[in-house]
């Protein structure tokens, strides 16, 4: 719904299947030792394919995921190239003894949105140096502190959201910034729930993630105007399905000269 309301595309990729029949991203779990799947290469190639196939913005591509997907977010930020502009890991962490190669030495500062439950008993907020299942992993504070320092942020604004459900699971936001106009901010949202997106009912975390990403969306619509077009063949939506023209949606206009016009009619 947030994508429909704000006119951006969302892709939900699936990782490969492990020996137990579960889909996963290869982030360095102990029980995946020896797995050589290159998920960084896969996701960056997928992003490039979607950008070129559907004329999506190369400069406004972001990455988020929960749990294993959150850990993939961290891995991409440290070891990936510059395909993704900002990251939003949810209930994730980093496994320093796993496959990561550029821990604390990423290519460039990037904006970071982190959300994690203080009562998460799957991926503990404080980390675990001797986990017998996943492998040792870092605390949320360690990772947030790194990105705050790496991004040269010195200002902190703390807000506590109203406890709308009166359940004591208050969400608190910590927003790190600097006086520079182009600073790569780091936001941390903590809640009193467990290993989830933050289901305390006080905020919609997906909306907060989009609010953060949209801060770094340059030329957000990036509509490529074509001066001279031939005959229109058909119109498709983001999924390649033929549709009729409608308002407030990304549509692709296919012409008989091979060109495609991406357009949004706003009403």
What are these model-predicted stretches?
Residues 250-267:
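C-terminal tail/sorting-segment detector
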